[in-house]
């Protein structure tokens, strides 16, 4: 999937690409944006720095599990607030200020001096707490949708900078497709691929908290201070060739041991998948 597109609705509303500027005051009454979840084909994690963040190198690939955010203009009495409603209620998804989509709308308003608020409608399709960055996709979609609705006209590089302030995984959905993430994962560089890939995801009833997995990773590595590895040439070659089997042989994730330590029963799932 390529970078996100905003689809406004209204009598004179044009289609708006997230990488191009739009008029200061859009005429659309609502804007819909779809954003993909992701899978990490490779993840190398280093020791945390003084700020507590882990340096890493990863390869993201967008998947066709799609989050949809619709940004709607508010009535006069609600003017200036940011609200979020789920299309399908889910107790695991907050709708208050802790939701990344709400934070994204507020951050964009603050950065651009917009005084009006927005009503966000969210349709979720990415599993919660599955490591597939559904919340980050929501935030990216909210940035693009509000940028179009409010006519703030920020280009993609400026949206990406705001996205990085929200979380390391938020910039990637703005470009989608397949990309290398470096730094904290927020520095995104697209890479060439060929063909399409069909992923099978085994979903557990209870997800794993990303912070909890990183904490266990730190406990397991101890004073070893692992160095961040580069993306293997075998993996990028497989992507360039569209070779699914070679790509499968190159998949690697430094957090797998920590996840298995927290949830040992996942080892059986992995064994079944590898034998299939």
Short names for language-model regions:
Residues 175, 180-276:
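Conserved, helical-rich catalytic subdomain that frames metal- and/or nucleotide-binding sites
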Residues 1-4, 18, 269-276:
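Oxyanion/phosphate-interacting regions
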């Amino acid at each position: 999937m390529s970078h996100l597109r905003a689809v406004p609705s209204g009598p004179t509303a044009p289609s708006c690409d997230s990488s191009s500027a739009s008029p200061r005051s859009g005429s659309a009454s609502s804007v819909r944006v779809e954003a993909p979840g992701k899978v990490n084909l490779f993840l190398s994690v280093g020791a945390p720095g003084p700020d507590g963040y882990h340096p890493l190198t990863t390869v993201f690939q967008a998947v066709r599990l799609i989050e949809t955010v619709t940004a709607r203009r508010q009535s006069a009495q609600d003017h200036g607030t940011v609200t979020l409603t789920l299309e399908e209620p889910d107790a695991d998804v907050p709708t208050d200020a802790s939701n990344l989509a709400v934070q994204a709308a507020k951050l964009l308003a603050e950065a651009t001096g917009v005084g009006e608020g927005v009503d966000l409608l969210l349709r979720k399709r990415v599993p919660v707490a599955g490591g597939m960055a559904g919340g980050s996709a929501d935030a990216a979609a909210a940035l693009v949708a509000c940028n179009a609705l409010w006519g703030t006209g920020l280009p993609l590089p400026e949206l990406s900078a705001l996205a990085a302030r929200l979380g390391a995984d938020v910039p990637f959905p703005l470009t989608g497709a397949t990309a290398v993430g470096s730094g904290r994962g927020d520095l995104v560089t697209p890479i060439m691929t060929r063909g399409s890939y069909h992923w099978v995801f085994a979903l557990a009833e209870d997800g794993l908290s990303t912070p909890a997995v990183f904490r266990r990773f730190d406990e397991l590595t101890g004073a070893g201070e692992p160095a961040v590895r580069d993306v293997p040439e075998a993996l990028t070659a497989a992507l360039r060739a569209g070779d699914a089997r070679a790509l499968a042989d190159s998949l690697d994730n430094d957090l797998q041991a920590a996840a298995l330590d927290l949830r040992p029963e996942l080892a059986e799932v992995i064994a079944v998948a590898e034998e299939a």
